[in-house]
């Protein structure tokens, strides 16, 4: 049993070493990670397989492979439900935020389902002690895309009333607020909001 564990551990570590090569394209890194996941799954190492899948989602995000990201994350959520002893829900939430954002971009996913995924994300962040800031941020971004400026304003107000925490991305929010002010013709507001970015106060 120990020898078997050592063998697959070394096989996975060898693949991970290859992913450290900065000249690799994200697609090549993704393929190496998929092979590592296959080995972890074969050996029923759920904890490691989950870590590897979260890394894979990062590479798939760079490739804009939305549908594939969603499939990978669905597997992570299934594994979490069956292995709450080894997988911490909190570790999944940042990537869940990405996944929910992906669902808006896929026309084959009906809006009802997108909303249901958003509600599930909302439930999970609340029970892990996070504010709803990231939830409202996502909806405000999508309303701008849909040119629903009044609705976007409602979500922005709600977002700004929630506390900033580890699920928030201040630079993303600032970037988005600039888009909102520019889209709605509030150029003075956009200019004053842009100062921290111009002065490199927010990265």
What residues fall within each predicted segment?
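Solenoid-like repeat scaffolds
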Residues: 3, 38-45, 77-86, 120-130, ...
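Non-membrane alpha-helical segments in proteins
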Residues: 10-22, 35-36, 47-65, 91-105, ...
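Alpha-solenoid helical repeat scaffolds
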Residues: 171, 175-176, 185-188, 199-203
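Extended alpha-helical scaffolds
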Residues: 127, 131-153, 157-171, 179, ...
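C-terminal non-catalytic interaction modules
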Residues: 1-6, 12
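Helix-turn-helix repeat elements of alpha-solenoid scaffolds
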Residues: 22-35, 62-79, 106-120, 144-158, ...
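Residues within HEAT/ARM-like alpha-solenoid scaffolds
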Residues: 7-10, 24-31, 44-52, 68-71, ...
